[in-house]
Amino acid sequence: MTLDDSSLQKYGFIKRETLGSINIDPLQTGGLLTEAARQALVEWGDGYSVCDFCGGVLDQIKKPPIHDFVHKALPEFLGCDEARVTNGARESKFAVMHSMGKPGDWIVLDGLAHYSSYVAAERAGLNVKVVPHAGSPEYYLDPEGYGTAIEEVTKESGKPPVLALVTYPDGSYGNIPDAGKIASVCHEYEVPLLLNGAYCVGRMPVSAKEIGADFIVGSGHKSMAASGPVGVLGVSEEYAPIVFRKSVYSKVKEVELLGCTARGATVMTMIASFPEVVKRVRNWDQEVENARWFSARLEDMGFIQRGQKPHSHDLMFFEAPGFYEISQKIKKGRYFLYKELKERNIHGIKSGLTKYFKLSTFGLGKEKLGVVADSFEEILKKYENV
């Protein structure tokens, strides 16, 4: 490629096509920036903007107040002893896995774990034992399955796994497992537990200490109204010296964080949104009520919600026999739903999906959720004689 003026025209400022739509994409609903974060994005957008008064360690910067955010606010918010800001939830998971295990060791994952949990384990050289779920329709995860998995690893390898992980909730069905019971089971075998709260931290109340988790992971760009990539990591006092160990070459830098992590706009948008994020977590009961109301509306139309019932999270998975039947009868039917929703200024269901899809009701409120539900009903009626 020749980098001449003509070829460079496709780059530069690019408008976002979906901006302003009613957004039901589970990846995006919890990451929409607050007004304060949008201002911070411009104010702190330069690469190393937060380093005007840096003494060499990101989380020790006091102006802006990154130190207080990381060492005072985040531990309280996450319910942990020590916390750090990272470049994302997957980076947080890898930091824990890499510091807790050695190549060839084992880790236990739930059957609904995100792909990045597997990849993080793979990158750390760990073997994976999976706790199976019960399958359709609820995909229930039995806490006792962790005990079985730990015993299997111990029998096969001669020693217990170095870590167990539970996804809370999972990113497919929005199920919230009994993490407290899982923690108890794991601790009976002296196996520490990592709570993957990428869809939890910043949306709903959660405390690592109350659950009994030794580690907690969150995603700023997925659930804390921050500009990504940015995440959080909370660690118990017992394991903090392991995960946050210092480099022998640069004595103030933490090895697993490669010294410093989220700099500039990422950490500052997270900080800017934090007051509102704390407040919205207190409104979680209303979010659950809205999700259940929306699910009931869709099920009245013939949709089938998979996963836990009654549901306790904004992320939901639906089977849509009505939409799928339409897609089989019309030209280019795979894409009809995406086009119909786009015409109604609704974004979030991926192009080509009609039989199964997931969505999120987070932050929309009853009025916008009503618009989405009404739109689904209108689309079904539009094609009922096809």
Swiss-Prot record:
GO function term, MF aspect, one: Sep-tRNA:Cys-tRNA synthase activity
Gene3D superfamilies (alphabetical): Aspartate Aminotransferase, domain 1 (3.90.1150.10), Type I PLP-dependent aspartate aminotransferase-like (Major domain) (3.40.640.10)
Catalytic activity: O-phospho-L-seryl-tRNA(Cys) + hydrogen sulfide + H(+) = L-cysteinyl-tRNA(Cys) + phosphate
Keyword Lipid biosynthesis attached: no
Source organism of the structure: Methanosarcina acetivorans (strain ATCC 35395 / DSM 2834 / JCM 12185 / C2A)
PTM annotation (N6-(pyridoxal phosphate)lysine): residues: 222
CDD domains recorded: SepCysS
Family according to the record: Belongs to the SepCysS family.
Subunit relationships: Homodimer. Interacts with SepRS.
Leader sequence segment: none
Function summary: Converts O-phospho-L-seryl-tRNA(Cys) (Sep-tRNA(Cys)) to L-cysteinyl-tRNA(Cys) (Cys-tRNA(Cys)).
EC main group: transferase
Binding site for pyridoxal 5'-phosphate: 89-90, 196, 219-221
One Pfam entry name: SepSecS
One of the protein's GO biological processes: translation
InterPro entries xrefs: PyrdxlP-dep_Trfase, PyrdxlP-dep_Trfase_major, PyrdxlP-dep_Trfase_small, Sep_Cys-tRNA_synth_arc, SepSecS/SepCysS
Cofactor entry: pyridoxal 5'-phosphate
Catalytic activity, EC: 2.5.1.73
Entry-linked HAMAP family: Sep_Cys_tRNA_synth (MF_01675)
Name assigned to this protein: O-phospho-L-seryl-tRNA:Cys-tRNA synthase
Keywords: Protein biosynthesis, Pyridoxal phosphate, Transferase
